[in-house]
Amino acid sequence: MGQKVHPKGFRIGIIRDWDSNWYADRDYSELLHEDVKLRKFIKDRFYAAGISKVEIQRTGNRIRVTIHTAKPGIIIGRGGIEVERLKVNLAEMTKKNVNINIQEIRRPEMDAQIVAENVAQQLEKRISFRRAMKQTVGRTMRSGGIGIKIAISGRLGGAEIARTEWYAEGKVPLHTLRADIDYGFAEANTTYGKIGIKVWINRGEILPEAKQRPKEPKQKEMEEAGR
């Protein structure tokens, strides 16, 4: 049985970049664990803000945190009070100078992580999983998606035996490296147990810039002779 590679990791260095951008020798494991802690802290505190990802850059004694969110107002707060509190909390956790940058996600229907969390919230409100999947797929396709695929696993509808249900529309080519495939995962805590949601969204193709091939010697001679 074939297993699927993570679509984001598969495209790093081709059409995607790392979410953590720094270099370390001996402190690598400590900084890696610190990144995980920072992301978990931000995600847990502002779960309702629809956070897609948190990018972390380190230079010396400074940390630059970029939060990609669908609802920046929740993180900023009235008069910027919430973001200042967050800045202080992160500085206390890391003992370093922290700079926070917030980027708004204009089309949350095209972000796989936000879509997965939205489906999870619907399942926790006891909405039928089929209805939740169908509505979500329709919204994404209307927003300009080339294709979307959703997988929901667990005791669906309170069934005794766990199973996986799929719903897909359009094209989602997982092995086409130039295809901008976004992937998201979320969990819904229901009365019957946890239900896992996976979402793949095809947002089109990212083509590399066309490189001019050097002209061959014979071609150059012919062009010069023609002049």
From Swiss-Prot:
Keyword presence, Lipid metabolism: no
Keywords, alphabetical: Ribonucleoprotein, Ribosomal protein, RNA-binding, rRNA-binding
Residue ranges constituting the KH type-2 domain according to the UniProt record: 38-106
BP GO annotations: translation
Superkingdom of origin organism: Bacteria
SUPFAM superfamilies found in the cross-reference section: Prokaryotic type KH domain (KH-domain type II), Ribosomal protein S3 C-terminal domain
The UniProt record lists the keyword Signal: no
InterPro entries per UniProt: KH_dom, KH_dom-like_a/b, KH_dom_type_2, KH_sf_prok-type, Ribosomal_S3_C_sf, Ribosomal_uS3_bac-typ, Ribosomal_uS3_C, Ribosomal_uS3_CS
Gene Ontology CC entries for this record: cytosolic small ribosomal subunit
CDD domains the UniProt entry points to: KH-II_30S_S3
Pfam families registered for this protein in UniProt: KH_2, Ribosomal_S3_C
GO molecular function annotations of the record: mRNA binding; rRNA binding; structural constituent of ribosome
The family this protein is said to belong to: Belongs to the universal ribosomal protein uS3 family.
Biological role: Binds the lower part of the 30S subunit head. Binds mRNA in the 70S ribosome, positioning it for translation.
HAMAP family (UniProt xref): Ribosomal_uS3_B (MF_01309_B)
Subunit structure, interactors included: Part of the 30S ribosomal subunit. Forms a tight complex with proteins S10 and S14.
UniProt protein name: Small ribosomal subunit protein uS3
Biological source species: Syntrophomonas wolfei subsp. wolfei (strain DSM 2245B / Goettingen)
